[in-house]
Structures are given as C-alpha cells and as structure tokens.
C-alpha cells in the first residue's frame, strides 16, 4: 500500500500539461534519445525547425511541441508515458514477487510442481542483472518500434528524418 502511495505523484505527471514555452523539444531530446523527425519549416531561423517565438506555424508537424497525443487534451509524449508505465509495472511486480516469496518461505502457500515433476524451488533463480537486461531489451524493442513508426509517419508527410539521407522525389 505504501508503494502505491509513492506512485501517485508519477501518475500525476501523466495528466499534467506539458509547458509549451518551457521545452522547445520533446522529452526524449531532454534525455538524449534522438527519435524526433525534423519539422516545421526547412528554412526557419530556429535550429529545431520551429519559429522562435511562434509555434502557430508548427501545428501539423511532427517536429513541434503539441503534436503528440495527450490524455484528456493535455499533451504528453509517448516515450515518457511508456517509461513511467514500465517503471511503475516493475516496482509493483517487484513488491508482489517479494510478498509472494515471503509467504512461500513461511509455508503459507502450497508447493507447486512443474510438469516434469521437478520442484519449483530446485529451479535456478533469475538474478536481478538478468531481469534488468531483459527489461532493457524490451525497452530497446519498444523504442525501435516507435522509431519505425515515426519514420513511417515522416515518409508519409514528406518530412526528412535527422540522420537519414534526403529522399529524392
């Protein structure tokens, strides 16, 4: 129950509006993930592709704040949502597994055997390092999927992706 109360502020972050004037780029630029397709006007004076003082010309571009989907009209970036959700799931699952192991150690749960007849306690436990590597692998797969999706959107809207060669007509 205590862990649930600690996660409530994280949930609050999901519904907060993102300050459009405070961040000139999406959240993954803040943490160094380069997934954002380049945006608004190719000859714009701003290096990010948006007008410095006016985001009105950027409403339909992937490269500008405010394009990304939100909850209840408040803007949220998908990578931030995935990161927070994954972190919450990891914390909650860790607490549940810890409680379950404590009950098993006290003998409150019946012993479970696998189909091979081997007792479940005889199976090797998975280390924390292995679990972290598996989670990082899943997050990497999610980011690759998001990047592919963004590249597909960019090619549909004729927007050049940073780092990719320009597409000729």
Swiss-Prot record:
Pfam families per UniProt: TMEM89
GO cellular component, one term: membrane
Keyword terms: Membrane, Signal, Transmembrane, Transmembrane helix
Record-linked InterPro entries: TMEM89 (IPR028069)
Segments on the Cytoplasmic side according to the record's topology features: 97-169
Membrane topology: Single-pass type I membrane protein
Localization: Membrane
Residues exposed to the Extracellular side: 23-75
Transmembrane stretches, start-end: 76-96
Signal peptide residues on this chain, from the entry's feature table: 1-22
Protein name from the UniProt record: Transmembrane protein 89
